[in-house]
Regions:
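Active-site glycine-rich loops that stabilize anionic/oxyanionic intermediates
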Residues: 32, 36-40, 115
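Alpha/beta-hydrolase-fold enzymes
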Residues: 121-208
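Alpha/beta-hydrolase fold nucleophile elbow
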Residues: 103-115
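Glycine-rich nucleophile elbow surrounding the catalytic serine of serine-hydrolase chemistry
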Residues: 113-123
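N-terminal cap/lid segment of alpha/beta-hydrolase-fold proteins
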Residues: 1-26
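Conserved serine/cysteine hydrolase catalytic core
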Residues: 216-250
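Alpha/beta-hydrolase active-site loop
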Residues: 81-102
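Conserved alpha/beta-hydrolase
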Residues: 47-75
Length: 250
């Protein structure tokens, strides 16, 4: 396996997006584009990439806006941008897919999104139908519309108090605290992330992981969730059998 790192311009017009490509030692038979979760970065997925390259898959990914090494000078971590910046993150994902397609012409391209990355992937599937051969959504979710609306109101209120470039202890508590309660007694504040204590410890030791997302990021993510849960948008996503092609090829 060979790892290659490079940057490409974000749709925000100011950030250089840190991108990674893992290429198998053999001729690749398909490409998988990864969309990572909140408060992490794409190199956390290198063990997965190593496994997939052994089976002949090329793997591509990038650090989302405000994550990992995709943070513009003077910008806070875990911040996409001003109102509407969810669209920038989705456009960056499309740009990464296009770069992967140019790098490996003629090969089927699949998309895998995890957690927040799954919400970005679902928005991608709505905005750019037919541009991937299939998609895998891990750690995704479905929120009642009333809860999404309440979250957006709360995020707007907190943003008015301290600004959207800052985090809110209240918003972060409501968003994440219940996850860890299901794994009490807790060893760390992130036990819910993985059944592997080694994986949790690696996350805690990684300076590019963790931290509280900004209010602006929560606002944008809730905006994205509201979009992907509309019935008319759900109907625009790829059908299940397209994704089954990926499992069959593995």
């Amino acid at each position: 396996m060979v790892r290659n790192e490079f940057t490409f311009p974000s749709a925000d017009g100011r950030t250089g997006i840190h991108a990674v490509e893992w290429t198998p030692d053999m001729a690749p038979r398909a490409v998988l584009v990864l969309s990572h979760g909140v408060s992490e970065h794409i190199l956390r997925y290198e063990p997965l990439a190593a496994y997939l390259t052994e089976w002949g898959f090329a793997v591509a990914g990038h650090d989302h806006l405000g994550h990992g090494l995709s943070v513009a000078a003077g910008a806070p971590r875990l911040y996409f941008g001003p109102r509407g910046s969810w669209d920038w993150a989705v456009q960056d994902l499309y740009a990464r897919r296009e770069l992967a397609g140019q790098r490996f012409p003629g090969l089927p391209v699949f998309l895998l999104g995890h957690s927040m990355g799954s919400f970005l992937a679902r928005t991608y599937l709505i905005r750019y139908p037919g541009t991937v051969a299939g998609a895998i959504l891990m750690g995704t979710g479905q929120m009642p519309p009333a809860l999404v609306a309440a979250g957006r109101v709360l995020a707007a209120r907190e943003a008015r108090k301290v600004g959207d470039r800052h985090s809110s202890p209240l918003v972060n508590k409501l968003a994440f605290e219940a996850y860890n309660q299901k794994f009490a007694p807790n060893r760390t504040g992130y036990d819910w992330l993985s059944a592997s204590t080694e994986n949790v410890d690696q996350y805690l030791a990684d300076p590019l992981c963790g931290g509280d997302p900004t209010i602006g990021l929560f606002r944008e993510m809730l905006r994205g969730i509201a979009c992907i849960e509309k019935q008319e948008n759900l109907k625009r996503m790829n059908r299940k059998y397209d994704t089954e092609r990926f499992y069959e090829s593995v």
